[in-house]
Amino acid sequence: MAPRKPSKKVGPQKRPSAEKRVITSKKKQLRNQSFKSKVRTILKKFELAVQSGDVESISAGLRSVYSIADKAVKRGIFKKGKADRVKSRTSERACPAA
């Protein structure tokens, strides 16, 4: 048989699936870290509002904590139990101040 000629296709190079999994998992890890950081920041702002004792900022902070916890569950970053725990603890902190 005659030797095969190399094809002249120009396009994206194929990569092994294991390498692709590494790349996609790193992207997902960065996205998750960023979101978890956002959650921690909102929780810290809520704690500051509780310490200040301002009822309006406490209720706004509680709304934002509930919202971000539910978004984390929806995106698969938190499990439902963790989000429920976060919401329960923040509502406990808000009740004595309100």
Swiss-Prot record:
GO CC annotation terms, alphabetical: cytosol; small ribosomal subunit
Statement: the UniProt record of this protein carries the keyword Protein biosynthesis: no
GO process annotations (BP): translation
Keyword Cytoplasm: no
Key words, A-Z: Ribonucleoprotein, Ribosomal protein, RNA-binding, rRNA-binding
Compositional bias of kind Basic residues: 1-12
GO molecular function term, any single one: structural constituent of ribosome
SUPFAM superfamilies named among the record's database cross-references: Ribosomal protein S20
Chain segments carrying region Disordered: 1-31
InterPro entries assigned to the protein according to its UniProt record, in alphabetical order: Ribosomal_bS20, Ribosomal_bS20_sf
Family indicated by similarity: Belongs to the bacterial ribosomal protein bS20 family.
Cited PANTHER family: 30S RIBOSOMAL PROTEIN S20 (PTHR33398), SMALL RIBOSOMAL SUBUNIT PROTEIN BS20C (PTHR33398:SF1)
Record's function text: Binds directly to 16S ribosomal RNA.
Protein name: Small ribosomal subunit protein bS20
Organism: Chlamydia trachomatis serovar D (strain ATCC VR-885 / DSM 19411 / UW-3/Cx)
